[in-house]
Structures are given as structure tokens and as C-alpha cells.
A protein has these predicted regions:
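Acidic/His metal-coordination segments adjacent to aromatic residues that form catalytic metal sites
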Residues: 9-28, 84-104, 160
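Acidic/histidine-rich catalytic neighborhood
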Residues: 62-122
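Active-site core of glycosidic bond-cleaving carbohydrate-active enzymes
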Residues: 1, 18, 24-46, 50, ...
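Carboxylate/His-rich catalytic cores and anion/metal-binding grooves
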Residues: 1-8
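A residue-level signal for beta-strand positions that form part of recognition/binding surfaces
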Residues: 6, 78, 176
Length: 181
């Protein structure tokens, strides 16, 4: 999907096994695979089971491979996530329709950062794929930084924008604090 290699998991599936994005916005969220990778990584981290890590490594590598193709390098050398979405939130658009997709939402960047880190850590622990791990490190080092707003808070999007729903119940942009490390 999206013309990318690697592993992408949709947000949803239905009773018929259809898992393609059916709506703009929440259905095109790309964060499910890195979120699942977090659970696999936690299992490895707390168990230390190398056999488990060998089985989980293809998943970590597959998620990282998806980002190899999905990230877009901009004129400054930063790898942007385009399109990007912040779950169930929006940016007030021009006219009557909200904008559901943007560039490098905080949550997408944080999930990508973690997923690349899991792939790097697993490759190093298993002493495999040094070249791929080097690429993943480069991508990770050139992701966009967190953006702090004029009022001192971590912003949900790549720049200060009007909020579609101030006080929205999802604090997706805080993923980097929890459950991430």
C-alpha cells in the first residue's frame, strides 16, 4: 500500500477481511504497525529471550523498511512524514471542510522514531543487517524535532496551527512521553 515496501498495518479490518483505508483521515493512519512493534520490543526488553527476538526481527525490519519508502526528504535534509495524521483530530480548513492530513504530526514522528529504534536495537542485538541499521540510524537522526508552541506546549502538528477542537480527548502528540520511553 502507498507504493511502499515493508509492513503497514491498517487501523481496522472488517468481518470480510477488508483492511484498505475507506475514509480520509483516521482510516489512513500509518501508526498501527509501529505501535504493535512497541509491544514486541517490550516483550524482548523484559524477557531477554534471543529466540523471541529472532522471530520478531522481521517485523521490526519490515516496519522500518516501510518508513524507508514512506519518508520524504525535504530541502533541509529532514525526513518528513507525508501525509501525516493525528488520530481523530483535524485542522480547521478553508471553508466548511476541515483538513484531516498534514505533515509530520507529533505522534507519527514519535512512532517512526521508536520503530526505527526497535529495528536498530534488534539488528545490533542479533548482529545482523549492519548496513540497514546504519540507514535506519540516518533516517532517525533526521526526523523533524518536536515543535513547541508560542504558549510553551508541545504541538500536535509540524507548526502552530488553529486547533480544530481545543482540549480534544486524545493526547496523541504526547505518545513520546507515554507509552514511549
Amino acid at each position: 500500500l502507498y507504493g511502499c515496501r515493508g509492513i503497514y498495518l491498517p487501523l481496522q479490518t472488517d468481518a470480510w477481511g477488508i483492511s484498505t483505508p475507506e475514509a480520509c483521515g483516521w482510516a489512513v493512519w500509518i501508526g498501527a504497525a509501529p505501535w504493535i512493534a512497541r509491544h514486541l520490543w517490550d516483550h524482548w526488553r523484559y524477557s531477554g529471550d534471543r529466540e523471541y527476538l529472532k522471530e520478531a526481527y522481521p517485523f521490526f525490519a519490515g516496519v522500518a523498511e516501510f518508513y524507508e519508502d514512506y519518508l520524504v526528504r525535504d530541502q533541509t535534509g529532514t525526513y518528513q512524514i507525508l501525509p501525516s495524521q493525528s488520530p481523530e483530530n483535524f485542522i480547521p480548513g478553508l471553508g466548511e471542510f476541515p483538513v484531516l492530513l498534514g505533515k509530520s504530526s507529533a505522534m507519527d514522528v514519535q512512532l517512526c522514531y521508536d520503530a526505527l529504534g526497535y529495528a536498530i536495537g534488534a539488528a545490533e542485538a542479533l548482529e545482523v543487517d549492519a548496513d540497514r541499521a546504519a540507514l535506519w540510524k540516518t533516517l532517525r537522526e533526521h526526523l523533524p524535532p518536536f515543535v513547541i508552541g508560542s504558549d510553551g506546549r508541545l504541538l500536535e502538528w509540524d507548526r502552530e496551527l488553529p486547533e480544530g477542537e481545543p482540549g480534544h480527548r486524545h493526547l496523541s502528540h504526547l505518545y513520546g512521553l507515554y507509552p514511549s520511553d
